[in-house]
Regions:
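Short, low-complexity disordered leader/linker segments with a strong preference
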Residues: 1-31, 127, 148, 338-339, ...
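Surface-exposed binding/hinge segments that line
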Residues: 30, 103, 137-184, 206-208
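Alpha-helical secondary-structure segments
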Residues: 36, 117-124, 154-160, 200-201, ...
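N-terminal lobe/hinge region of extracytoplasmic solute-binding protein
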Residues: 38-95, 126, 195-198
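Detector for C-terminal structural segments
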Residues: 54-63, 208, 212, 217, ...
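Aromatic- and charge-enriched surface segment that lines or borders ligand/interaction sites
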Residues: 55, 89-134, 152, 158, ...
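Gly/Pro-rich hinge or "lid" segments in bacterial periplasmic/extracellular proteins
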Residues: 69-77, 173-227, 231, 241, ...
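Extracellular/periplasmic solute-recognition and catalytic clefts
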Residues: 128, 148-149, 205-214, 233-294, ...
Length: 535
């Protein structure tokens, strides 16, 4: 159906994302009601999740679609717990971990009434893993391990891998991997950019650009008893003040991306027990990226000096009071089984426990590199949280070793354009992902010829060698050792990128919203099926 037309009954539903909350304590879900939520964007660039990377597409249209597997909506904070959506069971891999055979639910229908079969699942994944010419698939690199995808019968999909890897199953749970209709993809692979047709818990009702998107309960949804909501309205509002006012006035119940600490405090103070709060470490991390093609940032000594100047252990605690950052960590999501311990981090330049020793070494390196009076411009994004706050903090840290930095702050579009064109000396970036999958999440740190997300303009065969070993390693202990070796190489030995504190998700929302639990990403758990309203 056209994404601008209304062809099914209206209904509203929303999904929140915040910090871990207790289970509903035996409460019986109530059916019905419309959930209004705010989306912190003016509009999604398109409705095709296969080609987009923004939460605006997920928050707008995820309720209309199904996926093959997903994070467990009852345990979304886990980095290892995956459950079926369209499949009937998570399979055990065969042939040395290189073959995964999924059985697909029977009786699933697209919203136009046509049956969904294994052929649709295979075609959708083929579209993502091996996109046809002219079709954008930004996560194609996530599936380098996939060889072929077959649908030998209407209820079976088989993934054949080139090699066994623990990165495959988490990659398969990617929330952008919506299942489309094979016949539609065959006819026009770009049809889904402007149209919506899925098999999810809600049916599309109406879309008004810059205003709202509406969905209604799918009465034929295959997961019987769900969804609880009669429908949802997602309200677009790119200004934070507008979103906060909407929640305060109960025109909206929640905003799934998250707010800074000050907004949490404001809403709790004003509304008391009418507001609940969930928080979580966020699978988003800030980092500084020097342009290796710009002198003196082609010199590892200069890059290393810049990371040594930063007092992450003390500075992060202060920054967390005003910005949505909190956790000191490496290139790997904190708390993941592959993440290094704090003791290991203390071995890495920029994470030493003695900041004075660290800054003395930074000054020595700058002098040795002939860059004692270093001045440069930091390219930053015109977004308060956390970009501007982190930018102010980091420039102050550098001043403590005599480095003078000014900020060039650009709107998101020109900021991205400058990155892609290499028109910067040093840039403040963010590395955000959905499902925690360290072997995939570190891809922006790979050489520029390999990763389109690396704007540092460097090639590093040694780094690639370590990564390839980790990707192919199936022993968890050996893999963890290799990933620490990779992290130390990126963050210390070459200091290709300066890893800053990981973000922290804070989601204050109306306490009548029930059935939702936080995850580590604002991309996850957004189909709204489990949410219900206690009013």
């Amino acid at each position: 159906m056209e994404a601008t037309s209304a062809t099914v009954a209206v209904s509203l539903g929303v999904l929140l994302i915040g910090a871990p909350i207790a289970a509903t304590g035996g409460e019986t879900p109530k059916n019905g009601g419309i959930l209004n939520y705010v989306i912190p964007a003016d509009a999604p660039p398109s409705f095709d999740a296969h080609r987009e990377t923004t939460f605006a597409t997920i928050h707008s249209a995820a309720p209309f679609y199904s996926v093959l597997i997903r994070v467990d909506p009852n345990n979304p904070s886990s980095t290892t717990d995956f459950v079926c959506d369209l499949c009937t069971a998570i399979p055990q891999p065969a042939y040395g971990g290189t073959t995964y055979t999924f059985k697909i639910r029977s009786g699933v229908k697209f919203h136009d009434g046509s049956p969904l079969t294994a052929a649709d699942v295979a075609a959708s994944w083929e579209h993502i893993v091996h996109p046809p010419e002219g079709v954008l698939s930004p996560r194609e690199l996530h599936y380098v391990m996939v060889d072929t995808i077959d649908a030998p019968d209407p209820t079976t999909v088989v993934f054949h891998l080139k090699f066994a890897t623990s990165a495959f199953l988490p990659a398969l749970a990617d929330p952008y991997s919506w299942i489309y209709k094979k016949a539609t993809l065959d006819h026009d692979p770009r049809w889904y950019e402007k149209n919506i047709l899925g098999s999810g818990p809600f049916k599309f009702v109406e879309y008004q650009v810059g205003q709202w998107i509406k969905g209604a309960k799918n009465p034929d949804y295959y997961d019987k008893g769900l969804p609880h909501l009669a429908g949802f309205t997602g309200i677009y509002a790119d200004k934070q003040a507008v979103r906060v006012d909407a929640i305060r006035a109960d025109r909206a119940a929640i905003e799934f991306r998250g707010f800074p600490p000050s907004v949490r405090d404001e809403l709790v103070s004003a509304l008391g027990d009418k507001i609940a709060v969930q928080t979580s470490d966020w699978n988003c991390g800030s980092f500084i990226e020097p342009n290796h093609k710009k002198k003196p940032f082609d010199d590892a000594r200069v890059r290393r000096a810049l990371t040594l100047a930063i007092d992450r252990w003390h500075g992060t605690a202060a920054l967390a009071k005003i910005a949505n950052v909190r956790t000191v960590g490496s290139v790997i999501f904190p708390g993941d089984p592959l993440a290094p311990s704090n003791e290991q981090l203390h071995e890495v330049a920029g994470f030493w426990s003695d900041i004075e020793k660290s800054r003395t070494e930074a000054k020595r390196l700058l002098k040795e590199a002939g860059a004692e009076n270093l001045t440069f411009e930091l390219l930053n994004r015109d977004v308060d949280q956390p970009y501007k706050y982190v930018g102010i903090w980091i420039t102050d840290e550098w001043s403590k070793i005599g480095v003078k930095v000014t900020q060039k702050i650009l709107p998101s579009g020109p900021w991205v354009a400058a990155e892609r064109a290499g028109d910067f000396a040093v840039v403040l970036q963010a590395n955000c992902h959905s499902v925690v999958n360290p072997l995939i999440d570190v891809q922006p740190y790979l050489s520029s010829s390999i990763s389109k997300q690396n704007y540092g303009n460097y090639e590093d065969p040694k780094q690639q060698e370590i990564f390839d070993k980790a990707l192919h390693e199936t022993d968890p202990a050996q893999q963890k050792q290799l990933m620490f070796q990779f992290a130390k190489h990126v963050m210390d030995i070459e200091a290709h990128k300066l890893v800053l504190p990981w973000w922290y998700r804070i989601v204050p929302y109306r306490s009548y919203v029930k059935g939702w639990k936080i995850s580590s990403s604002h991309y996850l758990n957004q189909d709204l099926a489990n949410i219900w309203l206690d009013k």
